[in-house]
């Protein structure tokens, strides 16, 4: 790997959606980059051949270089060193875990909240009708890069400004798997509460809600990951104490079925690479 690789990686800044097209697309790009790099590994946890489509030229050449295994490993090490806390492996582990949970549930339909550049509706064979809810800027950028398909319905919405129930007024009330990945920690407490309550009314009993969240204790921690998002004006605004999650969900009509940290998920898939204890993946069933 040449010096240019180090220069490019050192300049990364992790930014999350704030309603601005630039920040919306950069967040999705970084997750897509992690997925594209993972896809090039011989021991990959999943194959996302769509991820590269969402990347700008400055990242695509990294992905091409990563096809050569030693280079791919080197890129991963640089990312993990530059951004302690494990954002790369946390994203990879959660992607595989959610893929598995989705397959196990065998839903009648799928709802992707804050879909970003999630390609599950395209890459998972036989996936049922899928509704993608996201900020209009990110959704528009995504649709420029993939073909519309009959089983995919796009719903542009900002959950900090509009209720999910209003946005999905015509949503069929069927047994659904809801995937809410990488979003809650950037929303307000009121938005998370309202969305969970809406989900129990618009989906059928027995539906599965899969969501990620950060341990509330991490909201005040001086971690490099947290400092990075705060530095660019996107601090984490919502978290839950894991011990409180069962009760929190029960009050909103959901029964918790599982809750793993990203680190635990990485261990489940035999990956001894940095992943976060405070970044968590939970899944619950609608009563």
Q: Where do the model's predicted regions map?
A:
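Conserved beta-strand signature within the Rossmann-like core of class I S-adenosyl-L-methionine
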Residues: 203-216
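Short alpha-helix
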Residues: 237-259
């Amino acid at each position: 790997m040449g010096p240019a690789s180090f220069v490019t990686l050192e300049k990364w800044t992790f930014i999350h959606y704030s309603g601005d097209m630039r920040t919306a697309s950069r967040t999705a790009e970084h997750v897509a980059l992690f997925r594209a790099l993972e896809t090039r590994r011989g021991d990959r946890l999943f194959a996302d051949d769509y991820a590269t489509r969402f990347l700008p030229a400055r990242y695509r050449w990294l992905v091409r270089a990563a096809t050569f295994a030693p280079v791919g490993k080197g890129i991963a090490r640089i990312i993990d060193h530059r951004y302690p806390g494990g954002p790369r492996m946390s994203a990879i582990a959660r992607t595989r875990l959610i893929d598995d949970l989705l397959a196990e549930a065998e839903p009648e339909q799928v709802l992707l909240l804050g879909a970003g550049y999630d390609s599950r509706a395209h890459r998972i064979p036989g996936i049922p009708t899928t509704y993608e809810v996201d900020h209009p800027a990110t959704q528009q950028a995504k649709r420029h890069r993939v073909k519309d398909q009959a089983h995919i319905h796009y719903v542009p919405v900002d959950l900090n400004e509009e209720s999910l129930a209003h946005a999905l007024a015509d949503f069929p009330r069927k047994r659904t798997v809801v995937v809410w990945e990488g979003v809650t920690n950037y929303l307000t407490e009121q938005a998370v509460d309202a969305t969970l309550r809406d989900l129990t009314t618009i989906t059928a009993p027995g539906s599965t809600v899969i969501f990620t969240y950060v341990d509330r204790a991490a909201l005040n921690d001086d971690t490099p990951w947290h400092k990075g998002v705060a530095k660019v004006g996107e601090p984490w605004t919502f978290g839950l104490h894991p011990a409180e999650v069962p009760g929190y969900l029960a009050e909103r009509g959901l029964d918790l079925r599982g809750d793993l940290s990203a680190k635990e998920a990485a261990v489940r898939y035999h990956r001894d690479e940095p992943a976060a204890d405070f970044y968590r993946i939970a899944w619950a069933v609608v009563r």
